[in-house]
């Protein structure tokens, strides 16, 4: 029978949960695992995150650091070794006790565990491995676990811990290796990218061993949905690929890819059988696991079944939005990332060498990056389409999809009754669910704008870019400035009416704009 949570553990929890608040982990689990009658807890693929704080962060995971002690001196981190803060460390048993007690009280549905660096990356990962082993095998906790991989730990311990967690993430930290050297001098580019490659290969091998297609496992909960979707968009995917191969688009996308390579040296060959550069312990993970008896039967489990993710800090260094999304795209394409998270920089240390002192964090910029990220993951966009060398920032007043659309009016208007899957997805105001409803419904009847509204299409954005049976909703002119002004007014009328021409580029709407409709 479990004991109640002691006051000492609760005091540690107060300190270490506060220290973990800048780690971003607001996602559903991505892994399905029902209860088996013997263990406690379960994981569900479509959303263990039910509750969010006011700033949008998920609170259904117990999100803590194992310790806030650290041997590194990263300028952006509150736990840097030169900061005078109270230092505390959990034991593996304490983390297990907290997780199980909170789960039984229905406070949480999973665990997000990160850590500062105690002694060395290898020693820290060994402690995290012990914690997860006890949770899974002694306390029989079957819920969702997201673990932070520590750059510099050995492949041995990363392999073993990957069979105990659902998701593992190694933080990229900054969009460029140059930025990393400037603000986190103790962290090495190779020690970040190499474990990412190791985890990627481990996930691929594990899924092949269990007979699962990597794409099907990542994108769809059941096989029927997978094959229905593939049949539906097969021709559309071919047309999208042809569009991406066109000279203008391919040139811009090639520039974005080269920018990502330059930012992090992603073109270099990485050795998955790596030896970490910063480890300084008397024996490795294999000796540690053998000596403690904390070994597991690896083939019985999936390796990191919910995939790996990473995180970039936005606004700590001078990278543009174009550079950030180019690196994110490379992470998805070259490392099979499940998610790339973006965290608006907060200068918690009031470091004069970093921006943001006395200023709010760039939350709007973070939001725009997430919107662009979704366009790349689900809507068929590439980084080189959304931004370019000539236009390296997202618009503050309209979302990235609208920004792309008003800059590519030659692609519009789109006929709702005949356009293919990915063409419809590029229309502002039309999402993935709406596209599926449209394609299904138009087989049986002609669709009207009223029908589209019932299907979830946001007409205040879409009406400028679509026709139904050859007709637009209003007599709208396809003019970039005209449409942009209307989009801004629809989203933020207070801002638009108060804007002056010099500060905001776009003109205030006149009575003639309304008359022309």
What are these regions (language model features)?
Residues 62-64, 93-104, 295-296:
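Short, charged beta->alpha transition segments
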């Amino acid at each position: 029978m479990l004991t109640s949570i002691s006051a000492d553990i609760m005091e540690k929890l107060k300190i270490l949960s506060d220290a973990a608040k800048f780690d971003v982990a607001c996602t559903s689990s991505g892994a399905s695992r029902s209860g088996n009658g013997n263990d406690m807890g379960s994981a569900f693929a479509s959303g263990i995150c039910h509750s969010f704080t006011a700033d949008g962060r998920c609170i259904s995971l117990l999100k803590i650091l194992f310790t806030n002690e650290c041997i590194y001196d990263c300028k952006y981190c509150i736990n840097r070794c030169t900061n005078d803060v109270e230092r505390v460390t959990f034991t593996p048993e304490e983390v297990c006790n907290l997780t199980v007690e909170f789960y039984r009280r229905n406070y949480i549905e999973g665990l997000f565990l990160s850590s500062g660096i105690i002694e060395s990356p290898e020693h820290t990962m060994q402690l995290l491995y012990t914690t997860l082993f006890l949770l899974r095998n002694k306390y029989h906790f079957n819920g969702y676990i997201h673990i932070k991989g520590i750059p510099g730990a050995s492949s041995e311990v990363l392999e073993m811990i990957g069979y105990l967690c659902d998701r593992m993430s190694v933080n990229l930290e900054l969009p460029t290796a140059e930025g990393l050297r400037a603000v986190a001098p103790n962290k090495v580019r190779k020690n970040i990218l190499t474990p990412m490659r190791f985890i990627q290969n481990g996930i691929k091998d594990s899924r092949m061993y269990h007979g699962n297609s990597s794409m099907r496992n990542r994108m769809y909960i059941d096989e029927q949905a997978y094959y229905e979707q593939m049949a539906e968009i097969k021709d559309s995917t071919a047309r999208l690929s042809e569009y991406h191969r066109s000279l203008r688009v391919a040139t811009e996308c090639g520039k974005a890819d080269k920018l990502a390579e330059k930012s992090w040296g992603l073109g270099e060959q990485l050795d998955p059988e790596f030896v970490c550069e910063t480890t300084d312990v008397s024996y490795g993970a294999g000796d540690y696991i053998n000596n403690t008896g904390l070994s597991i039967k690896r083939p019985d489990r999936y390796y990191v079944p919910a995939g790996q993710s990473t995180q970039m800090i936005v606004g700590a260094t001078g990278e543009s939005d174009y550079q950030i999304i180019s690196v994110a795209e490379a992470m998805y394409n070259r490392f099979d990332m499940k998610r790339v998270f973006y965290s608006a920089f907060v200068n918690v240390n009031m470091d004069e060498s970093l921006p943001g002192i006395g200023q709010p964090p760039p939350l709007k910029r973070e939001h725009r990056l997430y919107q662009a990220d979704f366009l790349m993951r689900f809507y068929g966009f590439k980084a080189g389409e959304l931004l370019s060398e000539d236009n390296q920032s997202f618009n503050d007043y309209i979302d990235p999809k609208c920004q792309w659309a008003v800059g590519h009016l030659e692609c519009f208007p789109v006929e709702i009754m005949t356009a293919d899957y990915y063409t419809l997805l590029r229309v502002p105001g039309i999402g993935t669910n709406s596209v599926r409803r449209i394609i299904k419904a138009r087989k049986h009847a002609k669709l009207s704008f009223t029908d589209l509204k019932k299907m979830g299409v946001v007409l205040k954005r879409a009406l400028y870019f679509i026709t139904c049976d050859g007709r637009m909703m209003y007599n709208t002119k396809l003019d970039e400035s005209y449409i942009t002004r209307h989009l801004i007014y629809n989203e933020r009328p207070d801002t638009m009416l108060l804007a002056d021409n010099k500060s905001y580029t776009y003109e205030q709407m006149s009575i003639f704009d309304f008359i022309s409709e």
